Amino acid sequence: MIPNIFHFVFGMAPDFGGKPFSLVHYLSVKSAVELNQPEAAIFHYQYEPTGEWWEKAKPLLTLKQVKAPESIMGNPLLHVAHKADIIRLQALQETGGVYLDLDTISVRPLTSLYHHEFIIGQELKAAFVPRNWRQKLKKQLGWTKENSVASTGLCNAVLLAQKNSRFINRWLE
């Protein structure tokens, strides 16, 4: 079972990747905490943010300072986002729970999904899909209306996992 623990990752570089903690980040934390009432909402950071919105978010969070990894499996991690990717996976591997990117606004509780071992989102993009393909997809996928979106892969902006989930363990191998 996925524990009701939320994880957020931010501040893997001193300049925050040019994006200081903002209203959107605060709303991400606030909506997740209010809707899901987690046992803990853990904020993983190397460099602690500052500012008005950070001061509002801080009381909702348990702070966990981490050292951003420089490499994985002998390969250097050159981008801040890749360092954050590893931190989020390690956090879920260690305690399980829910990881949300800080631009994700919660609109419903996620507790009904906690019986799964692992959940990852699907990345979609608007695309032109020919009418005959849409009709086939509608029939095969049980859509109630025709969609004009296409999958571009998996998205790690929202992850739910049991502690030591097989999927994350394999991902980190």
Task: Show the residue positions of the predicted features.
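An acidic/histidine-cluster motif and surrounding catalytic segment
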Residues: 68-78
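Membrane-proximal basic amphipathic "stem/tether" segments
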Residues: 1, 128-149
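Active-site rim elements
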Residues: 16, 76-78, 143-147, 158, ...
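Catalytic core and acceptor-binding pocket of nucleotide-sugar-dependent glycosyltransferases
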Residues: 165-173
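GT-A fold catalytic core of metal-dependent nucleotide-sugar glycosyltransferases
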Residues: 80-133, 150-153, 158-161
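N-terminal anchoring/stem segment of glycosyltransferases
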Residues: 1-70, 163
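Flexible glycine/proline-enriched surface loops and loop-helix/loop-strand junctions
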Residues: 12-13, 152-154, 173
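Short secondary-structure transition/capping segments
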Residues: 53-55, 75-76, 111-115
